[in-house]
Amino acid sequence: MADTPNASGEPGELYLDAAATESVSPAVIEAMTPFLTEAYANPASVHQPGKTAARALDAARASFAAALGARPDDVIFTSGGTESDNLAIKGIAMARMRKLGLRPVCGFAEADGEQPANCRPRIIISAIEHPAVAQSAAWLHEWFGFEVVRIPVDAQAHLDLDALERELDGEASERTTMVSTMLANNEVGTVEPVEELVRIAHAHGVPIHVDAVQAAGQIPIRFRDWDVDALSVSGHKFGTPKGLGALLVRGRTPIEPVLSGGGQERGLRSGTQNVAGAVALAIGLNESNARMQAQYRELVASRDMLIDAVRRVAPRADLTGDPERRLPGHASFIFPGVTGEALLVDLDARGIAASSGSACAIGRHEIPATLLAMGLEPS
């Protein structure tokens, strides 16, 4: 929780929307500023200022990787979670399609317009993915004929592991390019059993991408220990400016670039590298991890106190997501008979900033797809 600015720029009373974005940490601003004002050279340049920038980039990459249980060469710096998810989904799926010998849009030119099932590439995602994942999968379907399989979730937003097993059994696994799933849901806070998901995917020889955008800085991330193939994070969720993120990719994982250009970031993300941004990511994540370790129990206690208080004031309110296996600072509710918009307007008038779903869907006046996937009826 933090102060929120009102329309005049003065602090309001209470900011309860950190799941959408955090404030930029003062330590992050202090650390990155010299690379905006003094050591601003292109890290690819051969002169001394360029070498200074390159050393700072390497140090930031190593620090950032360690904070995620990864190696420096796993890290591909990007512009945020959306780009990281796009690179993972499109890059891995296309590379795997070619590796498996599958043909894109094969059969679409035939008279019946249908694609033979035995050559159609597949991608498996969950029913509650962020639009950056879901729409990337839809793009693969629209342009290359991919079959998009959505794994259902239960009433607490946990993936149906048996359904995932069934979708990977038999010949279907030979056409499955990848699996992609959230680590923690941004709308209801449920944390998925990532190690079990990795075990299932790898048992069938299929790589798995994990969207950890909502989880990084809130719960420990152990990229290498989990044996994940690719993992996305976004800096503005843990105290950096917006527009910063990363995709972790194991060297064994087939992946193709989405952007063409100078071949920076292992040839997977062309564009002049943002040294100040890399420094911000390293400082922000390490600071968030330290705070998480020091204040985890306090944060959980505050969350549970809020949940209890809401239930006392509104006995009909339903907590969404898993009541136990959830992010430590996340609480979301359904209030029967009250629209989210009306509630938020009232809270805002009282100086309380909150959200009624993913910030990426604000203004659409639709029932959140996550709640529908959990089996909740529109009301």
Sequence positions of predicted segments:
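Pyridoxal 5′-phosphate
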Residues: 1-379
